[in-house]
Amino acid sequence: MLDIKFIRENPDIVKENIKKKFQDEKLPLVDEVIELDSQRRANIQEADQLRSDRNRLSKQVGMLMGQAKKDPSKLAEAEAVKKQVTDEAERLAALEKLEAELDEKVHHIMLQIPQIIDPSVPIGPDDSANVEVQRFGEAKVPDFPIPYHTDIRESFDGIDMDAAGRVSGSGFYYLLGDIARLHEAVLAYGRDFMISKGFTYCIPPFMIHGNVVEGVMSQTDMDAMMYKIEGEDLYLIGTSEHSMIGRFIDQIIPAEKLPQTLTSYSPCFRKEKGSHGIEERGVYRIHQFEKQEMIVVCKPEDSKAWYDKLWNFSVELFRSMDIPVRQLECCSGDLADLKVKSCDIEAWSPRQQKYFEVCSCSNLGDAQARRLRIRYKDENGKMQLCHTLNNTCVAPPRMLIAFLENNLQADGTVKIPEVLWPYMGGTKVLVPTKK
C-alpha cells in the first residue's frame, strides 16, 4: 500500500507503474482516490473548525449561565448559545459519520493500488516473461528413466494418497516410513541451516486475525488462498511469513534491534484456487504442507542487501543437497501487488528435463509495514516505516520432488547427501521396499 501523499503528489508515476503491471483496469482508481482524499481532508478541516467553535461556545454558555444568576436577562442569551452548541454537535456527528465513510472508501481503493516496483524488474505481462539470471550446479541428464515423483515415494511405501482422498479429499496425503523421515529431516536441516545464518528460530501461531491477513497480502490472494474459520475472526495461515510479520503489528522497533531475522516451521493451508489448481495424483500443489520460512524486518536502506542474502541462502541450501537450481527474476506482471521485487529459485527435474519453482524470495518494501504500522525511529528521532522481506527456506513435499529425482540411483535407491546423515540417524541410502 502506497502513501496517499505520494499518490496525491505523483499520480503519473503511480499510473505508469500500474501500466507496467498490465493492470490498466486499475488506472481510474488513482483519480478516484485522489478525489475522495480531497473530500476527506476538506471534511476533516470543517470538523476541526466545528470542534473549535463548539469548545468556544461551550465555555461561553458556562460564562453566561454564571452571569444569569445575577442578571436574569443573560439567561435567554445563554439558551440561544446552547442551541447553537446543539446544532453544531449534530453537524459534527454528521461530519464524523461522513469521515468514517470516506476513510473506508479511501482505504478500500488504496489496498488495490500496487506497490511501486523496483526499476530493475523486467517488464512483462505474466510468468512467461520471467528472466533467468543464473544457474548453479550442472543439470543432470540420467541414463535411466526417472519415475514420476509419487511413484518414487510409493516404491518406498512412503505415501498413501488414496487413503488421504477417502479421509480428506484431493490435495492431501499420508507420508510414511523413510519418506516421512526424509520429510522431517529436510525441515530440521533447513531450520539449523537458518539458525547458523544468525536467524532466530520461531514457532508462530497457525491461525491469525483478518486484519493481519489484510496487512500481509492482497485481497485477491487472500480470497484465492486462505481458509477462514467459520464464525471466528481467524484464518489458517498459508505460510508462516504471515504470522511472523504479524508479530510486529503496531510495534515501534528500537533502531538498534533492527534487523529482526526470524525463521519458522509451520504447517501451511491453501485453497490453491486459480489456473494451476490441485494436482490429483501428485504433491506439487496441495491443500496442506509443511514449510521452513525466513523473514527479515529491516531499515529501508538495508532491504536490497538482505534480498540478495536471502535468495543466496536458498541456493546454498539446495546445492548442499546436490540439487541444481537457477534464479529466475519475476517480471512486473508476475509480481503480487505488495511486492517491489521478487525472484524464484527453481530446482532441476531430471525426469521432466526442466526447472520448477521451489522457493520464492520477495522484497515488499514498506507495503506490509505501512498496512501493519511496523515502524522504528531513525537517528533524528523521526518515525520511519520498516521494510519487510521473506523467502522460502525449504517446503517439502515439493522440494522432495527435486531431491528424490536428483538423488535417485539406477537401482531405485536414493542417495542421502552427507548434510542430512545426522537427521536420518546415519542412514546414507534409502532402499525401496518394492520394485
Segments and roles (model prediction):
Residues 27, 135-435:
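TRNA-recognition modules of translation machinery and tRNA-sensing kinases, especially anticodon-binding
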Residues 1-140, 154, 158:
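N-terminal alpha-helical targeting/anchoring segments
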